[in-house]
Amino acid sequence: QTPVIVMTDHALATSYFTVNKFDLSRVSIDRGDLFCTKDTSEAAGYRRHKVTSSGVSPRAFPLQCEGILVCTDSDEHDEAGHLTEDAETRVAMVRKRMRKCDGLKRDVLQPVRYGAEASDTLLIGWGSTMGALCEAVDIMVAQGTSVGALHLGQVWPFPVETVADAIRKARRVFVVENNATGQLA
C-alpha cells in the first residue's frame, strides 16, 4: 500500500533483453490485511486509513462486501478518508505513513558485489552501469589493480550499512553514473 516509482536510466529504458522464463511457482502474492465482514453495522465503521502500528491499514475493495464505503482523498484525511485540516490528525497520519518505511527497510534489496570483497579501489553504480562496472573491474584486475564494484539494484530505501561498510574498506571510491548530474553521488 505504498506508491512505487521505478527509477531507470535511458540505456535500460530503451533496451531489450532476452531473459529466462520466470518461475511463477516461486511468486507469492501477499494482499496484506483485508477487511471484509457480513455484518453491515461493522462494515459501516470501516476506516480505510486506520492508524496502525505498522502504518499499513486494512484494505477493502469497492463493492467487495455489502455496506462498506471506501473513501479516500488526496489531501490530508482522517481514518475514514474524509478531508481534514485538524493538526493532531495530520501529525498522526504523517507518522502512520512514515511507519510504512520501517517495513520497507526490512526488505531492502542488497547491492551486488563484483570482484574482490575488500579492495583498494571501489566502483559504485546503479542502473545500466553494471556491465561497465564489471568490465572495468576485469580490465583493472588484469593490470594488477586491487578493485571491486558494488551495484545497487535499488536506491531507496538506501542500503546504508552495506554501502558504508564497503566504502570504509576501500582507499578510493568512484561513483560511476550514466547521467549528467551525479544523482547517486
Language-model features, listed with the residues they occupy:
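Flexible, low-complexity linker and terminal segments
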Residues: 2-185
